[in-house]
Amino acid sequence: LSWREMFTDPKLQSLIETGLERNIDLNVARLRVEAAEATLLTTKLSYLPSLGLNAEGNANKHDGATAKTYNVGASASWELDIFGKLTAAKRGAAAALQGSRAYRQAVQTQLVATIADSYYTLAMLDAQMAISNQTLENWRTTVRTLEALKKVGKSNEAGVLQAKANVMQLEASLLSIRRSISETENALSTILAMPSHSIGRSNLAEAVFPDTVSIGVPLQLLSNRPDVRQAEMELA
């Protein structure tokens, strides 16, 4: 199942695409794969013959005239892999390449998961802030109502103070939510290798969540994990 099939929210897909293109860790992993591919190619070339060219020239005089002749010879030689040195090097390079590819896949998988987690966290924080704002307005209305009732002797100071305490508590909660949103946006911007900015996102009602993944990981599925495959390649 590809990440596009798992995460179908268009705005989230756009963020993931940006992350896959710009993330520094993933680009480093790509360079590791390219280096491993170059090493494997070098070991394969070791099986080819080494070529040599020999050039000779002579000058002979005959009846006052000088005749020049040139000869170019080519030779080829193979290094005998008597002790399996070349074969071992090739196998090691192939294992290193597979390990690098598994590492790149592990980085990519973690990157996609982190971006998605941050995205849905922001959507939930937005929903929480909307609810808190509405609740705050309701309590402010309650305070005004209780103060009006107090003036006509139908409420007391304790009720007003309790309502005001609830207002202050909600105001503090909203500050905390805004701070969490800012911190999450900054962290996600860093992952995307972009300056800190407001992250475009769907609201919680519109956000498309992936289907629930069943709990429990069979051994066959565990062996397909990129980080597990990388460890296997490094131990090979």
Language-model features: locations:
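A short structural micro-motif
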Residues: 35-39, 167-170
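Small/polar-residue-enriched beta-strand and adjacent coil segments characteristic
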Residues: 2, 10-11, 15-18, 22, ...
